[in-house]
Amino acid sequence: MPTNTGVIVKQTSAEAIPLKAQLEVAVVGTCTTGTLAASTPTRIRTKEDATTILGAGGATDTLPKAVALLQRYGCGNLIVIKGATADEAGTLAAIPLLANDRTQLGITPQVVLCPSFNSTAIVAALNTIVDNIRAIALIDITAATSVNDALTARDADDGVGIKDNRIVVCFPHMQNTDDPTKLEELSVHLAGILANLANYGQSPLNQPLKGVNGTDVTMSLSYSSETSDNEKLNDKGVLTVNRNPDGKYVIWGGRNSSYSEGLTDVLTFINAIRARDEITRLVEARSIKFLSQESNFATASLLRESFIDCLSEEAAKRAIKQGYKATFNESKSDYNAGKLDYTIEFAPWLPIELITASVSISVSVER
């Protein structure tokens, strides 16, 4: 019989993080390796998909790098698309093709990225597509830009200076833990963080970044000083970073590019825009079921109850707050014309609970 006692330790290879984060994230960029066809939205669900479809990636390819980073966060519902040419012109031409995702892939992205590209033309194209599909676009201020130059760029009204609820501007680039010379776009980290939030109504504020240990430019970081670089950037509508007491980097700021210092508009919050989009999708789906019904008060009341039920389900998930309302506007409706008019109101969860503001959606159901 064996007489040895003690502890036996065996070394095994580490298992990859399961790709369970299902937020629909679309990445537009360049790729010169793999099997990815140009101008064709393509789904990536697994590590194997990424290896086959994207290959190892060329020196200036943006898609393989971005997908690898998103998969670090467990993202398993990615859409990639490249243009006919591996440059800005090709990328610019590919962005509008995201409108085809619903018909070609059966899904519509909720977050759109275009890593390494942030010209005025690129941002304008992103702005158009996210308005069209009800999503948000994440862009980065160019690597190695100083904090002062980043603040100056935000004063413009184009490119990274655009003021829009659906555009999120990120700064700085992050240094990879294993190779500090390898810079990673903060926007891609943010997309991974959004994919891992409990629901669309949660803010990314203070969520940790994975696999980074520095910024590409020197920055002063603080939770309390109004003169720190991260606070100056946040006041200009830039999503940036901070360091928690453990020294780990976290997202700092949950606002989009339409924010400016002191503004209390609820729609400057990323999660407020995402909540409005999600509730709109749910309301549309329920409204469609009533299109074939006779237009009268009974139908109007049933549809209102359906809206209330929808909001109740989302509040139970803590995606939105309690206190939601669905109002049938009989004075704006026309039974003879088959038109029913409603107002939907709800409040998202805000990082600053002193701001109590609701989001309103106007619904017109017409047969």
Positions of predicted regions on the chain:
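Short, intrinsically disordered N-terminal pre-domain segments
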Residues: 1-24, 364-367
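A glycine- and small-residue-enriched flexible loop/hinge signal that marks low-structured segments
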Residues: 9, 19, 26-31, 36-38, ...
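N-terminal assembly/attachment segments of tailed bacteriophage virion structural proteins
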Residues: 39-86
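Short loop/turn motifs at secondary-structure junctions
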Residues: 74, 106-108, 320
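Phosphate/oxyanion-binding active-site loops and adjacent basic polyanion-contact surfaces
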Residues: 87-91, 299
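Hydrophobic alpha-helical bundle architecture
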Residues: 290-298
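C-terminal structured domain segments
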Residues: 298-345
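C-terminal edge-of-domain segments
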Residues: 330-367
